[in-house]
């Protein structure tokens, strides 16, 4: 069947670190990473320009470490290194399925990755390469959600795809705890902030709103969902400035 034109031509996919851990929930499961890489490769083969930001929660969490007494700045830098580990593993899996991939880091580590340079990242995308952004924004106190929103703005992405584990969108309550929870199909960025819906942290939400970047929250565990989102199927929750506010 002939595909329609894509809704989004340049996307930034935000993956949690836990997405790479598989059923174990911690560490890196190579088979899981390879499965995700194949999903991304399928979309990339259709001519979609793709960047990635991957969290580091499968390897390290800075806030609990800080609460236990570790210096918060050092804890956050440790987490940034975790995101680079995840980026390198994902890059290898993408290379193995035939996708030319570059890792760029906000903290210089030129033996393993390029430094983040916006112009170079744009050229990679234009040449059909996938770019993975590691090490957050290079500063403590900023989440990888904020990294995703900032890098999406810098590369002029059409949308941020928030790939969730087993969660098919945004609800007014936790659907695992409340059977009456209702899923939102559409929201404005202002809705998200005003309703306190923690899709991403407030800094990331504001960045997305101010730069008019669509945000799509969807379940990544179902095969083909990334492609469905790119081609405009309403399978999750779309957050945009251009949707009439919901009551």
From Swiss-Prot:
Pathway given in the UniProt record: Pyrimidine metabolism; CTP biosynthesis via de novo pathway; UDP from UMP (UMPK route): step 1/1
Highest rank taxon of the organism: Bacteria
Catalysed conversion reaction: UMP + ATP = UDP + ADP
Tagged with keyword Magnesium: no
PANTHER family: URIDYLATE KINASE, URIDYLATE KINASE PUMPKIN, CHLOROPLASTIC
Residues given in the record as ATP binding sites: 14-17, 57, 61, 165, 171, 174
Entry GO MF terms: ATP binding; UMP kinase activity
Entry protein name: Uridylate kinase
InterPro entries: AceGlu_kinase-like_sf, Asp/Glu/Uridylate_kinase, Uridylate_kinase, Uridylate_kinase_bac
UniProt keyword annotations, A-Z: Allosteric enzyme, ATP-binding, Cytoplasm, Kinase, Nucleotide-binding, Pyrimidine biosynthesis, Transferase
Localization terms from the record: Cytoplasm
Entry binding sites for UMP: 56, 76, 137-144
Organism: Streptococcus pneumoniae (strain ATCC BAA-255 / R6)
Activity regulation as described: Allosterically activated by GTP. Inhibited by UTP.
Region (Involved in allosteric activation by GTP), start-end ranges: 22-27
SUPFAM superfamilies: Carbamate kinase-like (SSF53633)
Keyword Kinase appears in the UniProt entry: yes
Function: Catalyzes the reversible phosphorylation of UMP to UDP.
EC number from the UniProt entry: 2.7.4.22
Protein family per UniProt: Belongs to the UMP kinase family.
Example GO BP: 'de novo' CTP biosynthetic process
Subunit structure: Homohexamer.
CC per GO annotation: cytoplasm
């Amino acid at each position: 069947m002939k595909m329609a034109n894509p809704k989004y031509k340049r996307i930034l996919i935000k993956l949690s670190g836990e997405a790479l851990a598989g059923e174990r929930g911690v560490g890196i499961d190579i088979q899981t990473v390879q499965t995700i890489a194949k999903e991304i490769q399928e979309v990339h083969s259709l001519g979609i320009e793709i960047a990635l930001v991957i969290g580091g929660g499968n390897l390290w969490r800075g806030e609990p470490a800080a609460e236990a007494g570790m210096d918060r700045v050092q804890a956050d830098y440790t987490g940034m290194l975790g995101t680079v580990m995840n980026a390198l593993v994902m890059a290898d899996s993408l290379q193995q399925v035939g996708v030319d991939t570059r890792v760029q880091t906000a903290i210089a580590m030129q033996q393993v990755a390029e430094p983040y340079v916006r112009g170079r990242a744009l050229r990679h995308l234009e040449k059909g390469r996938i770019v993975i952004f590691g090490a957050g924004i290079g500063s403590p106190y900023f989440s990888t959600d904020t990294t995703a929103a900032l890098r999406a703005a810098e590369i002029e992405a059409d949308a941020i795809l928030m790939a969730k584990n087993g969660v098919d969108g945004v609800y007014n309550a936790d659907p695992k705890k409340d059977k009456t929870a209702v899923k939102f199909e559409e929201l404005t960025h202002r809705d998200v902030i005003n309703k306190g819906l923690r899709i991403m942290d407030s800094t990331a939400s504001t960045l997305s709103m101010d730069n008019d970047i669509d945000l799509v929250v969807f379940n990544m565990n179902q095969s083909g969902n990334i492609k469905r989102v790119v081609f405009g199927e309403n399978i999750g929750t779309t957050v945009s400035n251009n949707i009439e506010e919901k009551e």
